[in-house]
């Protein structure tokens, strides 16, 4: 019954705000990667660091020709609203290469709805791959999820939507990770995250994909690790990442 409900939920997703274009002369197998960043009020001290780190991430990937051809990147931020800063598409098609992205930290933490928007980007883009002629192959997508707290909402109507989204996102992640069709790496910033939730959102039963950062230096280093993961996976695939322990990486 859970799978039937999940499939119904997936069919209800809004895929209208998904990049439909592909560069057909690019025959590389695609690696979809999403950076999902909590920009609630408590992340305010990291605004400039996030901006600079994302620019450096773009630069690192773009310097590697093979990775640049294979990587498709999306950047989303979330607080009381969910913002698609960059749709999931070939990184070469991001004209500003991250220089236009701004992280304004304020408001609440709608984690479930943010994950739903992330899944819409992934599912929509996979549909584009499937319907392209010739069909575009892809590696398992990677979600890099960064937060310093836990879901927070004070509006009753929004809370209902948040709870529903969180329920289905957990089911989706658990299923896709279990079938090795998705990788989620959670990053706890500081000491106030809901650790059990951050682990659950990796789809794994242990802490292998939960990273902990305590300061700006460690958060900046996480983005360097992220670029290394993306560059490597764009060449050799992401299929083995769910076996890799990232919990001690800083």
Where are these regions (language model features)?
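Acidic, polar low-complexity linker/tail segments
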Residues: 1-34, 40-48, 126-139
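Short beta-strand-loop
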Residues: 70-101, 195-203
């Amino acid at each position: 019954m859970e799978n039937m409900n999940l499939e119904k939920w997936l069919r209800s997703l809004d895929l209208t705000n998904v990049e439909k274009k592909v560069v057909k002369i690019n025959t590389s197998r695609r690696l979809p990667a999403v950076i999902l960043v909590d920009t609630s009020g408590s992340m305010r001290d990291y605004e400039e660091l996030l901006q600079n780190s994302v620019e450096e991430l773009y630069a690192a990937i773009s310097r590697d020709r093979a990775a640049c051809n294979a990587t498709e990147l999306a950047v989303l931020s979330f607080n009381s609203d969910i913002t698609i800063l960059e749709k999931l598409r070939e990184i070469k098609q991001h004209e500003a290469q991250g220089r236009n992205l701004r992280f304004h930290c304020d408001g609440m933490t709608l984690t479930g709805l943010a994950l739903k928007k992330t899944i819409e980007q992934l599912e929509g883009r996979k549909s584009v791959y499937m319907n392209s002629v010739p069909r575009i192959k892809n590696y398992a997508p990677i979600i890099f999820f960064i937060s310093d707290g836990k879901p927070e909402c004070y509006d009753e109507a929004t809370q209902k939507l948040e709870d529903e989204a969180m329920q289905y996102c957990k089911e989706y992640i658990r299923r896709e990770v279990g079938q090795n069709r998705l990788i989620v790496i959670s990053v706890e910033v500081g000491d106030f995250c809901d650790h059990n939730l951050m682990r659950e959102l990796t789809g794994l039963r242990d802490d292998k994909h939960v990273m902990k950062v305590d300061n700006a230096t460690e958060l900046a280093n996480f983005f360097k690790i992220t670029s290394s993961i993306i560059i490597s996976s764009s060449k050799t695939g992401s299929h083995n990442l769910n076996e890799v322990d990232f919990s001690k990486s800083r």
